[in-house]
Amino acid sequence: LNTGVANKRMVFSISASLMNEIGAAELELGIKTHRVQQVTKKSNLMVSNTVFHRFQNLKLSQARPVIKLRQLAACTIVLSLAACASAENDEDKGKIGFVQGFIGGVVADEPNAALIGRDVLSAGGTAADAVTAMYFASSVTMPASASLGGGGVCVIFDNGAKKVEALDFLALSPKNIPAGIERPTAIPMNARGFFMLQSRYGDLRWAQLIAPAENLARFGTQVSRALAAELKPIGSALVQDEEAARVFSNSKGLPVREGDFIKQFDLAATLTEIRTKGPGALYVGPFANRFVNAVNAAGGYLTKEGLRSALPVWRETVQSLPYNHKIAHFAPPAAAGGVVGAQMWSMLAEYDDFDDADETLKSHMLAEVAMRSFGDRSQWAMPTGHSRIDPKQLVSEGHIKSLMNGMSESRHQSAQTLSSVPQATPETPSALSLVAVDRFGSAVSCNVTMNNAFGTGRIAPGTGVILSALPGLNGRGPMSLGPMIVMNPNSNEFYFAGAASRGVTAPTALVNVAARIVMGGQAPIDAIRQARTHHGGAPDQLYFEPNVSSSVLTGLKSKGHQVAPVQGLGLVNAIACPDGLPVRPDTCKAMNDPRSYGLAVGAE
C-alpha cells in the first residue's frame, strides 16, 4: 500500500496480570461467554503485527487502494479455499499472514478501522471478528457516529450454518426520564451488541479485537479526513463542553483539524476495562456505577438498573421477494430503512426488466419504487422507526403488488395520487457503515449511530464516552438505517453485502447500487461510482447528482419528473461477489463510496 503517508507498526503484549477472569457481568447478558473467557487461556497474549496507518493529507482517490493478494496457482478456484485451509497452522492463528490467498474483504467509513479489519481477516478471523474490531477502532477514530455511547444493527449471513439473521442493539431510551434533564441520553448498546455478534460468529480472542482500538486511544492517532469532515460543521459547539474540548480542541482552543494528533486517555481506560473484563464491565459492577454517575453529571439520565437490563436482541431479517433465486435480507424495524429497501427491491424483482432497462429507465424505475416505499412508510412507521404492522406483511407478494398499482415505464405517477402519500420527516444523516466478508463466504453488514452527530455533544467525565441522543426526537434515530445481504438460499452462496448512511437517501442509494450489480449485471466498481437519483415523494421531485448525463435528465423530464440537482446522494459501503462466494472469490470486489473518505480493502 503506497499512499505517500507514514506507516507505523506497533507490537505489544498484554500482561497476564491484566487477564482477569470474567465474572457475573457477562452472565447478565444471558449468552455464551466463551469468547471473552479465552482471554485468560494464555498467560501472555501477544497481539503482533498490528499496523496503524497515519493518514496525512489523504486524497479521496488514495483512500481506495487495491490490496494485491497472493494467489495459489496450483489450486483450482473451487478447491483453493479448502487447500489453503489445510495448509494453515493453528499455532499461528491470530497472527497477520495466517491466511494465505483469499482473505475476504472489509469496508469502513474511516481508513484506520478498515486496515485493522483487514489485519483481523489475515490473522484468521471471521467476518464477525473483523466487523467487531473495526467498530471498536471506529469508536476511537469516528466517535461522531460510533462512540461506545451509541447503538446499531447488523445483518449476518453464516455460510456454515446456512443462516441469515439480524442483531438489533440500537440505543434505547431510558424509562421514566425525569423532567428538567438537560440533555437526555440513550442507553449505550454498542459494546454489548458487538460482543453478542462476536460471541456467536467470531473465532479470535476478544482481547485481540479490542487491543488495536485501545492503542489508538492511548498512544494517539491523527484526525483523518473522515473525522475532520464530521467535526467541521459542529466542532465549535462541541468544544464548549469541557470534556470534549480536552480531546477535540488544539492548543489554541479551536477544534482539531485533519492531520492533528489526538489522544484519548479516558477512552483508552474504558477500552481496557472492556478488553480485560468483557463488555459487562460497562453495564454491571464498579465501573458501570461510575459510568452511570458520569452520565448524570454530563446532563444526561441513566440508572444502574436501566443500564444492566438493556440487552441486544436477535431478530428475523426482512426478506424480499426472490429475484433469480436470490433473496435480499434487510435489517428489521426500528431500522426502518430496511423495510423501505426490501420493498424497493421486491418491486424491482416483480418488475423483472431492470437488467434490460437503459439508464433513463433504470433511474425512472428506481424513483417510482422509492416514492411508493416512502409513501407506505408514512403508514406503518412510528417516530422511533418501529413498525405498527408486521414487517412480513409489508413485504408480502400481495402488498408489493398493491404498491405497484399505477406504476408505468413511460410515465411518472404523481406522489399525491398514491394510495399512501409520502410525508416529509426529518432524518439525521449521522450514521456509520461497516461491512466484512470472510474466506468462508460468510458476511456481516452493520450500521451504528449516535442518533445525531456526536450525540448529545457531551462526554461522560472520566470515561471518554460521547453520549448518544435519544431516538425519535426531531428525526434523531435509526429511521434511515437498513444494512442488507443478498444470498441464494438454494446454493448457500453469497452475492452482496452493504450498508449506507446520510439520512433519507441511504436506503435508495443502497438499493441503487445493489440492484445495478445483482439485477443489472453492472460491474461493482461502476455501480458504486454511477451518478445517483433519489425520489422520496415529499416533495414530488427527483433529485439528481451533478454528473447525471443530460440525455438521462431529458428522458426523465419527458416521463413527467420534476428534477433538481444536489451534491451527493447517500454513502454506500459494499462488498459484491457477482458470481457467488465461496465458489468464485476471484469475482469479489470491496467498494467504498467515492463520495466519502473511507477505505475498502481486500476482496480481490
Regions found by a protein language model. Give the residues of each.
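Active-site rim segments in enzyme catalytic domains, especially the processed small/beta chain
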Residues: A128, V140-A146, V153-F157, E165, ...
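Short, small/polar residue-rich loop motifs at catalytic or cofactor-binding pockets
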Residues: R315, T428-A431, A453, M479-L481
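Residue-level detector of structural "landmarks"
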Residues: L1, A25-G30, H34
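Internal maturation/activation junctions in enzymes
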Residues: E350-T449
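Extended C-terminal subregions enriched in glycine
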Residues: L510, M519-Q567
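C-terminal motif of bacterial Sec signal peptides marking the signal peptidase cleavage site
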Residues: A82-A83
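Noncatalytic scaffold domains of N-terminal-nucleophile
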Residues: S86-L115, D119, G125-V284, N289-K326, ...
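Bacterial N-terminal signal peptides that target proteins for export
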Residues: T50-A73
